[in-house]
């Protein structure tokens, strides 16, 4: 097991340009009350919400670059609503922002707003959830959803010695679908394994919990959970714990949340994956600064992930603490 984790860590870390980890997030700014610096660029960033640590870490990484260069960051939340995201982009266009960063909650629904920003001469950077309208954006920054799902599925197979039922929950999100496709295609390689896929409207804890409860009621012999986000895993772990199965179900998720890190240290969870949200924010900021200085920016920037296990969790936490100083 250590061999596979070490191999994957070596692979993804060889791609990294800077140290990994997530920095504890700052309190998000109110949309209308950001303190503006007039010397640098002004960039607005739209996240899916202002609660999940992942999104807060992206914003913190962006702030670390832009504000240290005399610029301003304004944080918007679409609340997973594409129409709200469109309105927020239109608001930034009217207010003549220099750059816009957005995670694409709906590729087709966001298209008109991307056209408006392009026509207004405002460069758009997509991150995490990207767009097919590559001609309308400056760059796209993300971890590859399918690849990380495929890695997690294979890792689960090794933990379970290639036998047993594994569960996950999908949502209409394209990125979630890609991750779950990776899960499925990895698990399909093992004839003695089965992936049970539930469905939910979104990846929030409150919508995931009843879905996982239902899966466990029908399939009490499930021995693995593959989670695609912090909030989703919060709901799943609550259901697993309520069923008295915490410690019996192998848990691998994309979270790196304080709860997941604690569970890893306590041996209640095997692996949690850090998508390097803070680094995604840093790359957004660096891309905007490069463009503002007339430098070339890659059209697609792949961000490596970091697998956290009981063997390296303390090292990971020390790295995060160092970055927060």
Question: Which residues does each PLM region occupy?
Answer:
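Sec-dependent N-terminal signal peptides of Gram-positive bacterial secreted proteins and lipoproteins
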Residues: 2-23
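A residue-level marker of the well-folded mature domains of exported/periplasmic proteins
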Residues: 20-325
């Amino acid at each position: 097991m250590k061999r596979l984790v070490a191999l994957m860590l070596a692979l993804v870390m060889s791609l990294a340009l800077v140290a990994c980890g997530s920095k504890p997030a700052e309190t998000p700014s109110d949309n209308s009350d950001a303190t503006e610096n007039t010397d640098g660029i002004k960039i607005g960033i739209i996240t899916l919400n202002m609660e999940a640590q992942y999104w807060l870490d992206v914003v913190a990484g962006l702030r670390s670059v832009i504000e240290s260069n005399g610029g301003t960051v304004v944080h918007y939340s679409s609340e997973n609503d594409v129409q709200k995201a469109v309105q927020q982009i239109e608001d930034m266009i009217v207010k003549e922002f220099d750059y816009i960063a957005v995670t694409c909650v709906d590729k087709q629904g966001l298209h008109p707003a991307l056209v408006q920003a392009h026509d207004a001469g405002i460069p758009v950077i997509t991150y995490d959830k990207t767009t097919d309208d590559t001609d309308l954006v400056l760059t796209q920054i993300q971890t590859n959803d399918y690849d990380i799902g495929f890695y997690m599925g294979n890792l689960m197979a090794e933990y379970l010695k290639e036998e047993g039922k594994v569960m996950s929950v999908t949502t209409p999100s394209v990125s979630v679908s890609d991750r779950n496709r990776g899960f499925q295609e990895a698990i399909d390689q093992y004839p003695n394994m089965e992936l049970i896929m539930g469905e939910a409207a979104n990846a929030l804890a409150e919508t995931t919990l009843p879905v996982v409860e239902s899966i466990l009621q029908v399939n009490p012999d499930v021995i693995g959970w593959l989670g695609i986000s912090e909030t989703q895993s919060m709901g799943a772990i609550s259901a697993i714990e309520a069923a008295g199965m915490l410690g019996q179900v192998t848990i691998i998720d994309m979270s790196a949340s304080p709860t997941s890190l604690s569970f890893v240290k306590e041996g209640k969870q095997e692996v949690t994956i850090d998508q390097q949200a803070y680094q995604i924010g840093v790359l957004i900021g660096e891309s905007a600064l490069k463009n503002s200085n007339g430098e070339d920016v890659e059209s697609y920037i792949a961000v490596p992930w970091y697998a956290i296990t009981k063997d390296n969790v303390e090292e990971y936490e020390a790295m995060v603490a160092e970055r927060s100083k």
